[in-house]
Structures are given as structure tokens and as C-alpha cells.
A protein has these predicted regions:
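Conserved segment of the helicase C-terminal RecA-like domain
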Residues: 110-116, 120-154
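Short glycine-/polar-rich loops that comprise or flank the Walker A/P-loop
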Residues: 50-53, 97-101, 109, 126-132
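SF2 helicase motor core recognition
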Residues: 84-102, 118-123
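Conserved helicase ATPase core of P-loop NTP-dependent helicases/translocases
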Residues: 31, 40-44, 48-90
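Amphipathic alpha-helical transducer elements in NTP-driven molecular machines
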Residues: 8-12, 67, 83, 87, ...
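Long, largely alpha-helical accessory region at the distal end of helicase-like NTP-driven motors
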Residues: 24, 146-210
Length: 210
């Protein structure tokens, strides 16, 4: 599994997509959420070999190292960081206003965590007009959590979630745009159809939102 997560083919695909969707502003200030420590560290190395300036931060990273990385990501200096790869940290309680691209490489296990990670890029800043969120969906069984998180619907109504996938941008307030490619849309529909919304974990997630 590790070899697949860090394969040259996967790295090329990730880079292709982050370049395709781009960012707002003069410089990239990106956060990339990974699923495991070894993946986080290896992907950072592979990005660096391709000319990006990145660092991997995990729960083992010191507070000083984290702060220096954040300061560098926020900077526009020539040698400042383009991306921070992270796992197990930055879900909440961290403020990096210049973040203009958030990349999800980890499975969506919880609507709450998904929103927390997405929120790292939602701080207002004069250097950007919007934030780009790119989610490389991997956990097919839990894909229904994506419309749950983005819509704010906590009743887990399947018809409402299907409608949001179909008409997300029309149902989202403000100038936000939500776009699913055809494969992603199909997998989310399949996940909604197969989901058992009486599971204990979903009930716990809903309770935490109260």
C-alpha cells in the first residue's frame, strides 16, 4: 500500500491536478493532508525532487519546527515553502490565513474532521480572493460524508444528499463553487445508496455537532 501511495505515477497525477485547479494569488501557500506519517514524509521528498519547496510535519514535529514551517508558508520570500504536508495535526486550532489551496490525500472518516481540514483555508486574507480545495477521494464507503460536510445537513437524509451532489453550487450560499467530476459523483451516489445511517459512529458525529 505504501508503494502505491508514494508511486511516481500518483505523484505525477497529484501535481497535474493541483496545477490544473491552481490557486488565488501570486504564490502558492498550500496544505496537503496525508493519511500516514511515512506517506507524508515520502511525498514531501518527491515533491522537493520535482522543484517544489515543501516540508513534512507530523505529531512528532516540535512546536518550534511547526511554527517555523507556518511562518515560511505565510511568507512570499523566494525560498519560502510552497506546501506543508501534514498528518494528525492542523485539523483545528491553527491559523494560517494565506493558505490558498488545501489538498486532501487522506480518507474521509468523519464529516467533522473534513470540515476542520477544509477550514484551514477559509481564513480571509488580502492575498487571496478564494481558496481551492482538492479532494483525492479514496475511501469509497465513506464518500457520503463529503456532501454531509459541505452541505451542513446533519439529518443524513439520502434524498437531500443526492440533491446536493447534483446541485451543490446552486445550494451553497455566497460565491462558493462545488464541482465533482463524473467518477467522483458516481462514487458518492454509490456511497449514499449503500450507507447505513443508523451506525453508531454517525450518531456520535451528529452528537458532537450539538
Amino acid at each position: 500500500e505504501f508503494n502505491i501511495l508514494t508511486s511516481e505515477l500518483r505523484v505525477d497525477y497529484i501535481i497535474e491536478k493541483i496545477n490544473e485547479y491552481g490557486y488565488s494569488g501570486d504564490h502558492i501557500h498550500g496544505l496537503i493532508f496525508c493519511s500516514r506519517k511515512d506517506e507524508c514524509e515520502k511525498l514531501s521528498q518527491l515533491f522537493n525532487l520535482r522543484g517544489y519547496k515543501t516540508i513534512a510535519l507530523t505529531g512528532d514535529s516540535s512546536e518550534d519546527m511547526r511554527q517555523k514551517a507556518i511562518d515560511s508558508l505565510e511568507s512570499n520570500d523566494e525560498n519560502s515553502l510552497d506546501y506543508i504536508f501534514t498528518v494528525d495535526i492542523f485539523n483545528e486550532g491553527i491559523d494560517i490565513p494565506k493558505v490558498n489551496q488545501v489538498v486532501m490525500l487522506r480518507p474521509t472518516e468523519s464529516a467533522i474532521v473534513f470540515v476542520q481540514q477544509l477550514g484551514r483555508g477559509l481564513r480571509k486574507n488580502d492575498s487571496k480572493e478564494y481558496v481551492v480545495i482538492i479532494d483525492f477521494i479514496a475511501n469509497y464507503e465513506k464518500n457520503f460524508l463529503i456532501p454531509v460536510a459541505l452541505s451542513g445537513q446533519t439529518n443524513y437524509n439520502k434524498d437531500s444528499l443526492r440533491q446536493f451532489v447534483c446541485e451543490g453550487s446552486l445550494m451553497t450560499p455566497g460565491a462558493s463553487t462545488i464541482q465533482f467530476d463524473q467518477i467522483t459523483e458516481k462514487r458518492i451516489y454509490q456511497s449514499i445508496d449503500a450507507a447505513n445511517f443508523t451506525q453508531v459512529r454517525l450518531i456520535k458525529d451528529s452528537y458532537k455537532q450539538l
